[in-house]
């Protein structure tokens, strides 16, 4: 008797989508739907609404729900993996239930981050959200959350059935090998654009990506070459894109990626407060790197 493997919709290039805002900072849902469809048409495998790049922290509950529904309508639920982060476990579970009702294939979840949660609290948090019934991808971002999903804790979460993959944003590529030793069935996803090749070579199964919002085709080409082990193709492209990719690990990543989108003819636009515009020096650096990528035919 053969069994069909469970789908893993987080594999491949999933874009943590930037959210188009009008001049009055209202969400432009039509532009967002078009953007999601454009990303998939240009080779990306899916979208991740309501991540940090999508400014979920400054959305109303109604806006946050509608963003998910808009993405599902644009590209199909199996391609949509929304972020469901919240200060409380019950609220995060409600967002996971909303994602399930909208037809999403999985959800992405940060650990508790209202305080420096210990291991018992982290496990309880993920267990609560897993009860919503969708596969959960853990998101490890100890830089911002101050809670580190170390390999041993990830192995426990996976072993207890609470998570099926992890978006790894610690920047420590050595962890890839320890995670594979402790939890070989836990899918590792590249979480920071500027360690893409390093984690791809280490066995990553997907990339939750920022810069494909502006440069989808070149980003997908880079990812495919890297996971195939074709470093002769990947490394020259990586070097050309890295001046942009490294912005994904900076505090100003939302503003930088939105500016690059504007430069290549997409609609990045403004950010909601408390994010402020880039400084003139930052804007010049992003603009120069983006224009260089455009001139090289990467847009």
Regions found by a protein language model. Name each.
Residues 3-146, 156, 299:
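Active-site beta->alpha loop and helix N-cap motifs at the rims of alpha/beta catalytic domains
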Residues 72, 93, 97-100, 177, ...:
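Residues within alpha-helical segments
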């Amino acid at each position: 008797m053969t069994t069909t493997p469970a789908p893993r919709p987080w594999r491949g290039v999933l874009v943590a989508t930037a959210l188009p805002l009008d001049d009055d900072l209202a969400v432009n849902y039509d532009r967002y739907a078009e953007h999601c469809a454009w990303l998939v048409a240009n080779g990306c495998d899916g979208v991740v609404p309501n991540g940090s790049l999508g400014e979920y922290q400054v959305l109303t509950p109604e806006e946050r729900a509608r963003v998910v529904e808009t993405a599902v309508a644009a590209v199909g639920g199996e391609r949509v993996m929304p972020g469901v982060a919240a200060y409380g476990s019950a609220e995060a579970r409600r967002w996971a239930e909303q994602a399930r009702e909208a037809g999403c294939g999985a959800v992405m979840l940060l650990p508790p981050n209202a305080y420096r949660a210990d291991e018992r609290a982290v496990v309880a948090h993920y267990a609560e959200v897993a009860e919503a019934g969708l596969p959960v991808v853990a998101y490890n971002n100890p830089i911002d959350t101050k809670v580190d999903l170390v390999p041993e804790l990830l192995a426990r979460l996976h072993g207890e059935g609470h998570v099926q993959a992890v978006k790894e944003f610690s920047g420590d590529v050595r962890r890839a090998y320890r995670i594979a030793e402790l939890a070989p069935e836990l899918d590792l996803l590249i979480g920071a654009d500027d360690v893409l090749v390093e984690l791809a070579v280490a066995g990553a199964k997907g990339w939750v990506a920022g810069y494909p919002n502006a440069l989808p085709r070149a980003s997908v080409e880079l990812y495919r070459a890297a996971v195939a082990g074709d470093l002769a193709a990947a490394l020259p492209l990586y070097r050309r894109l890295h001046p942009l990719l490294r912005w994904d690990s900076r505090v100003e990543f939302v503003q930088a990626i939105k500016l690059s989108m504007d430069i290549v003819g997409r609609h990045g636009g403004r950010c909601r407060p408390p994010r402020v515009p880039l400084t003139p020096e930052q804007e010049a650096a992003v603009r120069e790197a983006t224009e260089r990528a455009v001139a090289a035919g990467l847009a």
